[in-house]
A protein has these predicted regions:
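Edge beta-strands of extracellular beta-sandwich domains
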Residues: 32-39, 237-238
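Acidic, divalent-cation-chelating loop motifs in proteins
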Residues: 45-50, 78-86
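Surface-exposed, flexible coil segments in extracellular/virion-facing regions
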Residues: 1-11
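Acidic, low-complexity intrinsically disordered segments
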Residues: 44-45, 50, 95-260
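Surface-exposed, short loops/turns at beta-strand junctions within beta-sandwich domains
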Residues: 13-16, 213-214
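A structural signal for beta-strand boundary/capping segments at domain termini and interdomain linkers
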Residues: 3, 29-33
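Alpha-helical segments with a strong preference for the paired helices of cellulosomal dockerin domains
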Residues: 51-74, 86-110
Length: 271
């Protein structure tokens, strides 16, 4: 910004370091200038990625939206959003911001003296299906421990399966969740909160319609999984839908008949 006023003022909307350049010109048109680098320094508040002066739940939602590619944070926003100081932006950062908002954490950044290990095993089960069926594909977690943040990618073949509903499960009750269908057959999700008092539960339940022309097999995959700030798992879990002829009518007889039981086990002479 520039001004020709003798007394000027300017409001800086974003944190950072700003140079000031002063140019003086006399009545004969002769001018001279001086540059004062980083003269104005607007401080940052850890966790305040929205630049509104406070760290709050809205900032946590912006972190999650960045992780699922709904929004893109600037390098400076990523730096101050990294409240765990691990040099990355993660669902755990969003969890710490939420915990700070409700008073569970006294200050940001937050680097606990003892870091609790976080883990969990993800499970999916194979199933049989045929065209026209609706199938439920739950993704569960077992042996969960200190899962305060979770992100992943769900993929499936949209030429075979049409997504009917996606419902996040009871394990994520109370979590802040963001999701984004980045393209047909691909969904990113990220969740932050405090793990409930359970080691097992449903993360998400997907309901698909099996499209016409399905005669082989198709898979649904949970990939790029990261719990808190653990190393990312390339494949968290995977299931296969196999074609099974007539499965929708299995176990439902169309014709009933009653025949003589011979020989009768209770009276062998009966015919």
């Amino acid at each position: 910004s520039s001004s020709n006023d003798q007394n000027t003022s300017f409001t800086y909307l974003y944190p950072g370091e700003y140079d000031i350049k002063l140019t003086v010109e006399d009545e004969f048109g002769l001018a001279d200038s001086t540059l004062l680098p980083s003269l104005v320094q607007v401080d940052t508040i850890f966790g305040d990625v929205s630049w509104n002066g406070i760290s709050q739940a809205f900032d946590a939602s912006m972190v999650l939206k960045h992780l699922v590619e709904v929004e893109t944070l600037s390098p400076l926003q990523i730096e101050i959003g990294d409240v765990s100081l691990d040099e990355s932006i993660s669902t755990l950062d969003a969890s710490y911001i939420l915990q700070y908002t409700v008073g569970l954490i006294d200050a940001l950044p937050h680097t606990p003296d003892e870091v609790t290990g976080s883990t969990g095993d993800f499970m999916m089960e194979d199933m049989g299906a045929e065209s026209g069926m609706l199938i439920d594909v739950p993704i569960t977690i077992t042996n969960a421990e200190s899962v305060n943040g979770l992100k992943g990618r769900l993929t499936y073949d949209p030429a075979v399966l049409a997504l009917d509903t996606l419902i996040f499960g009871e394990f994520l009750n109370g979590y802040m969740i963001e999701m984004n269908e980045t393209q047909a057959g691909e969904i990113l999700f990220a969740a932050s909160g405090n793990q409930p008092n359970t080691e097992t539960g449903t993360i998400v339940n997907l309901t698909f319609e099996v499209l016409e022309g399905f005669y082989g097999e198709s898979s649904v995959t949970l990939s790029d999984v990261r719990v808190n700030e653990n190393e990312e798992l390339e494949i968290g879990a995977e299931m296969t839908v196999n074609y099974v002829l007539g499965i929708s009518r299995a176990g439902v007889p169309e014709v009933f008949a009653l025949h003589q039981n011979y020989p009768n086990p209770f009276n062998p002479v009966t015919r």
